[in-house]
Design a protein with these regions (language model features):
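Short, intrinsically disordered, charge-balanced linker/junction segments flanking boundaries
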Residues: 1, 77, 87, 133, ...
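An edge-strand/N-cap motif at the start of beta-rich repeat modules
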Residues: 1-47, 54
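Conserved beta-propeller blade signature
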Residues: 2-4, 39-41, 87-89, 133-137, ...
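Loop/turn residues immediately N-terminal
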Residues: 7-11, 45-49, 93-97, 139-143, ...
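Residue-level "micro-hotspots" composed of small/polar
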Residues: 9, 21-30, 34, 60, ...
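Short loop/turn segments that connect beta-strands within beta-propeller blades
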Residues: 14-18, 53-57, 100-104, 147-151, ...
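Residue-level detector of Asp-centered blade-edge/turn motifs that repeat once per structural unit
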Residues: 34-37, 82-85, 128-131, 172-176, ...
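Beta-propeller domains
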Residues: 169, 175-176, 185-188, 213-217, ...
Length: 392
């Protein structure tokens, strides 16, 4: 512990375990992506797109310019995706889909008379499959795929497919080439080889339902577990045994409204919510095949930008550093440097009140001194039987 004496400002103290997360204020952060140079691209809520050069810390701002066709289509950026060819895809609210490549913006918008265009200008989620097809989740227009080479769109909605709902909130492509589609009314899964969609409300057997069907993010970890963030808790699905575990506040979750999921280099999970950050360590019982989950909670007292984080605004960088975005900027951290203090602090009494008045050291009550030294150094306190109203 480092103690600092100040001029007229009292005593300050610092320990590395107190503030665990570095903070950068860059506005209300809604999305984070990394390019091939290790630079950060940060989407904001109505403040445009920020290109943050990681080596110099210099930000470059992209905003919508009405008179400039080569500019961002909307300052409300909702999601970002860097594809394998190095292009940056930018989902916006109200402005459709942008693609940024070598200083040029290409815009994709809904055109009412063109059924092969974007179905909705509110883009919520993006993903790229192994064929280079960009998958697009919209807010009301269903799921779409875009072939960047031809500019051709294909649409999947509740009318043309078994999609659970037309508001798509999250997209994730699993190792077995399935597209996990989180919607406002359940989870859909597409086999990318056949384009067949099935929808789930819980386990395949029907034994357990998701805690809530309004899904904020879907994520597959290195174990093959499917993590599902909802408005009413975190759902963890083990497809090997068709078992669903639901974590709530009583299980150590920071808040029921979970919004973001990411796995660190140690195969542990970090979950953002409306009230803080939860670090989850999964532990496997080899006999039963079941997992137990240990949770640690962090909030503003640990250096977080605030307790509130934005939906899917979380990213693990190529360096292993994790970036999480919220209403007051981003926090960055390496999970190995977050130390959890398992030593319980000693309990100290700091005040002793007799008849609602604090007893001072050396002060005489009646004919005797009750405290001859500071309270935390006293083994016992002797009182007269009439001195029967006290508190510590």
């Amino acid at each position: 512990m480092m103690w600092l004496g100040t001029w007229k400002k009292g005593i300050s103290y610092y320990h590395e375990s107190i503030f665990k997360f570095s903070l950068d204020y860059v506005g209300d952060v809604t999305a984070v992506e990394e390019d091939k140079n290790g630079d950060l691209w940060i989407g904001t809520n109505n403040d445009g797109l920020i290109h943050w050069k990681i080596n110099t810390g210099e930000p470059q701002l992209f905003v919508r310019e009405v008179s400039d066709a080569n500019s961002l289509s909307s300052d409300a950026v909702s999601c970002l995706l860097r594809t394998r060819d190095g292009k940056l895809w930018i989902g916006t609210l109200g402005g459709g889909l942008d693609c940024y490549d070598n200083g040029r913006f290409t815009h994709y918008k809904n055109m009412v008379k063109n059924r092969k265009s974007l179905t909705d200008n509110n883009i919520v989620a993006l993903a790229e499959d192994k064929s280079g097809i960009v998958w697009i989740g919209t807010s009301g227009g269903g799921l779409q795929s875009l072939n960047p080479r031809t500019g051709e769109f294909n649409t999947y909605n509740t009318t043309t497919s078994d999609l659970a709902f037309n508001t798509v909130s999250s997209l994730y492509i699993t190792r077995d080439n399935s597209l996990m589609i989180g919607t406002s009314r359940g989870l859909s899964v597409m086999d990318l080889s056949t384009k067949k969609i099935i929808s789930l409300t819980g386990t395949k057997s029907g034994k357990t339902r998701f805690s809530n069907q309004n899904i904020n993010q879907v994520y597959e970890d290195s174990r093959g577990l499917i993590w599902i963030a909802t408005r009413e808790g975190l759902n963890i699905y083990n497809p090997k045994i068709d078992e669903l575990t639901i974590l709530a506040e009583k299980n150590g979750l920071s808040n029921l409204l979970t919004v973001g999921i990411v796995e660190d280099d140690n195969s542990n999970m970090w979950i953002t919510s409306a009230k803080g950050l939860t670090h989850i360590i999964p532990m496997l019982d080899s006999k039963t095949g079941m997992y137990d989950f240990r949770c640690n909670i962090y909030d503003e007292r640990d250096g977080l930008q605030s307790s509130g984080f934005n939906q899917r605004s979380v990213k693990k960088l190529s360096s292993g550093e994790i970036v999480i975005g919220g209403v007051y900027g981003i926090n960055r951290f390496f999970s190995d440097k977050i130390k959890y203090n398992e030593v319980l602090p000693n309990v100290f009494f700091t005040h002793f009140l007799l008849f609602n008045k604090e007893v001072e050291v050396g002060e005489v009550y009646g004919d005797k001194v009750i405290l001859d030294k500071a309270l935390n150094f006293v083994d016992q306190v002797e009182l007269d039987y009439k001195q029967n109203m006290f508190c510590v």
